[in-house]
Structure formats: C-alpha cells, structure tokens
Amino acid sequence: MSTKFKSEEVTANLNYKDLFKKFTNLNNLKDYLPNEVEEFESSTDNCSFKIEQLPKMSLQMTEKIAYSHIKFESNESQIPFDMYCYLNKNDDNTTNVFLEVNMEVNFMMKMLVQKPINIFLEKFTEIIKKI
C-alpha cells in the first residue's frame, strides 16, 4: 500500500540556489538533523540514519532538478521509501520548502511508522526555518 507523508511548507532564509547547493551534498545534512536522528553517516550522494522506533534507513540521491526538487530513494533499507525535497523560490533571499516521504507499507506498518516519520518531518522543517 502506498503511503504519503508530507511536511508543512516552511520558509528558509536562504536563496533557492544556495539552498539547493547545500541540500545536494548529503554531508551537509548533519548540520540540520533533529535530535531524534541517530547513527547518521553520509557521503556526497548517500546517507544512513536511524529514527526512534524505526530500523536504520539508507538514502541515495537519485534525482536533482536544478533549484526545483531533489529525490532520495531508500537504499538497503528494510522499509522501501523515497523522499522528495521541494524548493520554491519565494524572493531573492528566501525559499519555501516542503518534504514528502512515500512508502510502500501495509496498514499495520503504517501505524507503526506514522508517528516517527511525522516527527522527523516536523523537526526537519523547524530546522529549515532557522537557516
């Protein structure tokens, strides 16, 4: 069953080009992760991490549409998923951002992952607001 989790749209105090550049190097993510994320490891195009009750997850950047969105897909994770980071130019100095996580999970697994994923999205967007 396909399940979608979406963050609220927030505003980053950085222009869309600089924000895109920052988010397309996964080594930069460590500076923005919420406390609920543990065991974070990264390279330029890959990262892995653990969130609360969920198994360790791995992401690989698979698509970069300049200044528009970045797609990450699960890589060697127990739960198949992808995550999109959408960037929308607001003005010369700010960018609107929202995240979307798509997972193939059954109803029982959805109930298990819903809270940790929503917490992750909420915490991550709070951090984006502070950029």
Regions found by a protein language model. Name each.
Residues 3-9, 46, 56, 82, ...:
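Intrinsic-disorder/low-complexity, polar/charged segments enriched in Ser/Thr/Lys/Arg/Asp/Glu/Gln
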Residues 10, 32, 69-70, 115, ...:
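Amphipathic alpha-helical hairpins
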Residues 102-131:
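A conserved amphipathic terminal alpha-helix motif
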Residues 41-45, 65-68:
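Ser/Thr- and Asn-enriched, surface-exposed coil loops between beta-strands
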Residues 1-41:
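Hydrophobic ligand-binding cavity/cleft-lining segments
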Residues 52-94, 102:
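Hydrophobic-ligand binding "helix-grip"
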Residues 19-23, 29, 47, 61, ...:
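Hydrophobic pocket/interface hotspot
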Residues 15-21, 53, 112-116, 120:
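Short amphipathic alpha-helical segments
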